[in-house]
């Protein structure tokens, strides 16, 4: 996973699609500091740049943090933020220009066609995709539809182990210390797993998220349409 993450990050940088904000995980307890030390060892083994920081060093990178309640932090300067919509748009454009990719926008998938002979595992071979604009013959179909992927997979009598979940996040701001950066994100993302929270800059505001809640699963059929 570390190698996959590094390769993905490098690809986004090569395409000028990422912003290297850096990321810091802070520790409030000695047990957490011990975990960060273990993580430092793993980062070194994988060749990923990382640093263990004392509270004062964390404060230098994130001036609005209260250094009195932490013992230190694990800093990875190559943590980056990527706009998924922009990234998909740029990759699609390059695929069209360089590889002859065909794109059919605003096209609804109605069904996945399969042959009549089950394989030993009980599944059938894909033969095509039915859309509201016609049928496309295909030997392979890649399902990459986010939270709606299972709806497509069901059409081929298969299943993708993916369940959407609601995540809690609060937007705080605007804050002068953030607005003065004139960036979408100018400070490192901070994770505080002793409280199961994290924060990240969003232009002049701060987004604070929490993992300290029960899992809130959400069926894709209940997600409102953009229309």
Region roles according to the model:
Residues 23-27, 73-75, 169:
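Short aromatic/hydrophobic contact patches that present stacked aromatics
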Residues 131-186, 204:
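Central helical "cap/lid" subdomain
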Residues 49-51, 102, 159:
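Conserved beta-strand segments of alpha/beta enzyme cores
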Residues 25, 128, 169-171, 189, ...:
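Conserved hydrophobic/aromatic beta-strand scaffold that supports enzyme active sites
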Residues 74-140:
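Helical element adjacent to the flavin cofactor pocket in flavoenzyme catalytic cores
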Residues 158-159, 175-227:
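Active-site lid/adjacent beta-loop-alpha segment flanking the redox-cofactor pocket in flavoenzymes
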Residues 18, 113, 130, 137, ...:
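Well-ordered beta-strand positions
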Residues 1-61, 194-199, 203:
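Dinucleotide-binding Rossmann-like beta1-alpha1 core, especially the glycine-rich loop
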